[in-house]
Design a protein with these regions (language model features):
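Entry/N-cap segments of selected transmembrane alpha helices
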Residues: 92-118, 188-197, 324-346, 372, ...
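Transmembrane alpha-helix boundary signature
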Residues: 38-50, 66-69, 83-98, 116-135
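Hydrophobic core segments of alpha-helical transmembrane domains in multi-pass membrane transport
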Residues: 27-40, 80-86, 116-118, 198-203, ...
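Structural signature of hydrophobic alpha-helical transmembrane segments
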Residues: 69-81, 129-143, 184-197, 235, ...
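Hydrophobic transmembrane alpha-helices of secondary-active transporters
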Residues: 61, 65-66, 70-94, 306-326, ...
Length: 438
């Protein structure tokens, strides 16, 4: 398949996804920089105190709410993971993960890109209090990675962009599994049974193809609460909810009605302003077009801008701020080295080696239009862990390991920055080399 055909094969949803994620990545970067500046300025005491401010409401002697930091990490991030879950479901059903032939190469790449960084970190921090942070360098921040690759524009093959997106989606799925398996403590089975009951009700609604999002979202709040109380991180509830959202579109006459409305609009007289009749026709078209979308598409379309331009930038601003002063012990075990080497070395090596071996063994086939040099470049960009890595660091290190958490955040910022710069320069040089050969 040539480049033109590959580009045409990109769905409108995928193109919109690339656009929103890439620009969201730039906004993320600006918020991370702002957080570091504020955390090392005269405003730092207010900055750190802000996130511990309780936010909620009082009912008698009971306070219902969390600190601002917990609202961001547990509640708003649940909405982000809901969107991630919707993306994964869409890709599994209709996208690049919908068949073994399509999914095998990026999924195996994601697997290698998680195992190698995790092993590097674990090897350096084995038998230390910080060994539990092995999941930190395993993650990829899709918004940042896409932000970098989109800045390169046409210098990067479209097929490589598709590969990186699919790899990142598979990586997100892997990160969810890692969180569920390794960062869950003190399970409370009564609450888990309650969560299971909610999931069964959601499954019945899905089976009945209930298209209104309201019952799913209301039950989703209940599911979030049960999972939160069970000891499993509440973001897992959001992913489960995403898989319960219906994806079927209605089989009725609305598409025919849309055509008729379009003809009616074309037959009306045009002027400087829309007539009342034209406004009514356009309103009807909007309603019927929305009804043709599946609940999954409607929810994903609603969440994408909120996630990209509010939740993730706010998360970055709340979590990227680290006060770099003499009180920080950069020699806490080998956290700094483990995270940086995991992201900058483990990611590209893991992705390149496992895909190279799997193709030689005829397990997978490399997508047409991209070379092994391109795969290595994608591996470098996959080393941009940033927000997902920071999210896992918050789970891996509690307040008892504050030094390790702060060092991990510095390492994530440095490792992600190094990976992004080297990856961008590498792909730029690769394009220049190809141009000279022509």
């Amino acid at each position: 398949m040539n480049l033109k055909k590959t580009e045409n094969a990109l769905s409108l949803t995928l193109k919109n996804f690339i656009k929103s994620e890439s620009f969201g990545g730039i906004f993320l970067f600006l918020n991370a920089v702002l957080a570091m500046v504020v955390a090392n300025s005269f405003l730092k005491e207010g900055y750190f105190a802000l996130w511990h401010t309780p936010f909620g409401f009082q009912v008698g002697d009971f306070f219902i709410g969390f600190s601002l930091h917990n609202w961001i990490d547990d509640v708003l991030m649940a909405l982000f993971f809901l969107m991630i879950g919707l993306e994964i479901k869409r890709e599994l059903l209709f996208g690049e993960l919908s068949s073994f032939k399509k999914a095998s190469f990026p999924v195996i790449a994601a697997l290698g890109g998680m195992i190698a960084p995790g092993l590097i970190y674990f090897f350096l921090n084995a038998n230390t209090p910080s060994q539990h942070g092995f999941g930190i360098p395993m993650a990829t921040d899709i918004a940042f990675a896409l932000g970098v690759i989109m800045l390169l524009g046409k210098r990067v093959p479209t097929a490589l962009k598709v590969f990186l997106i699919t790899l990142a989606v598979a990586d997100d799925l892997g990160a969810i599994v890692v969180i569920a398996l390794f960062y869950t403590t003190n399970l409370k089975f009564a609450w888990l049974l309650g969560a299971l009951g909610v999931v069964l009700v959601l499954a019945v609604l899905n089976r009945l193809n209930i298209r209104s999002l309201i019952p799913y979202l209301l039950l989703g709040v209940l599911l979030w609460f049960c999972v939160h109380q069970s000891g499993i991180h509440a973001t897992i509830a959001a992913v489960v909810l995403a898989f319960m959202i219906p994806v079927k579109i209605p089989k009725d006459s609305k598409n025919v009605e849309l055509l008729e409305l379009g003809k009616r609009y074309a037959e009306t007289s045009s002027g400087a302003l829309l007539t009342k009749e034209q406004q009514e026709i356009l309103h009807s078209i909007e309603e019927k077009a929305s009804a043709l979308q599946s609940p999954l598409e409607r929810l994903e379309h609603f969440l994408a801008p909120i996630s990209g331009y509010f939740i993730m930038p706010l998360f970055a601003f709340a979590n990227a701020g680290v006060s770099v002063d003499s009180s920080i012990n950069l020699e806490v075990d080998k956290v700094l080295l483990g995270v940086i080497l995991g992201l900058c070395l483990g990611k590209p090596l893991g992705i390149f080696l496992i895909t190279f071996i799997s193709e030689k063994l005829k397990i997978t086939a490399r997508p047409k239009g991209i070379s092994w040099w391109h795969i290595l470049g994608a591996g470098l960009l996959a080393g941009i862990g940033f927000t997902m890595s920071m999210f896992i660091s918050n789970l891996a290190f509690t307040s008892e390991h504050k030094d390790a958490m702060e060092v991990a955040k510095i390492a994530i910022l440095l490792g992600s920055l190094i990976s992004g710069i080297i990856g961008a320069l590498y792909l730029f040089a690769l394009d220049k080399r190809a141009a000279l050969k022509k």
